[in-house]
């Protein structure tokens, strides 16, 4: 959709091809990159897209389309030298697990980050109408009825709906990866050790992201 819909045209929109959609995505990002700032004030504009963020998005689009040479060229503008900051000041954090620490919002490794708020006038009664201003994903994938004893060292997690649990195959594929401990949480093991409790949902494995 390139033009606003009206009450008379909204029912006559033709479905276009995926190729046309991706061509438009490429066009939008290519035109936006020169106009975007290299950085934004962290205190007032965190979350706003920057030049590097748009380049990273364009690179991922190229990869999805199989355009490897184009992807390599644009991502080279974002990656920088291994171990050092890129031209926009982004660099990997020393510890992978620090990515998930609440105090590390909008850190140097973050190219694109969505800011959520709990201060909006919204609740679950408005589900699906666009008035939910929090991070619903945490609720969807959180362990159902999660709780832990006061003296437990288990992490503080929101109780959720137990959707999209990590599969056994994913667990097995990642267990030798150095990032494993900060990626998959075995709540089933925590429950067996008396450190936490939850109720398993559909296709429960006990593994949560």
Pin down the residues of each PLM region:
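An aromatic- and glycine-enriched ligand-binding surface/loop that stacks and positions planar moieties
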Residues: 22, 30, 48-208
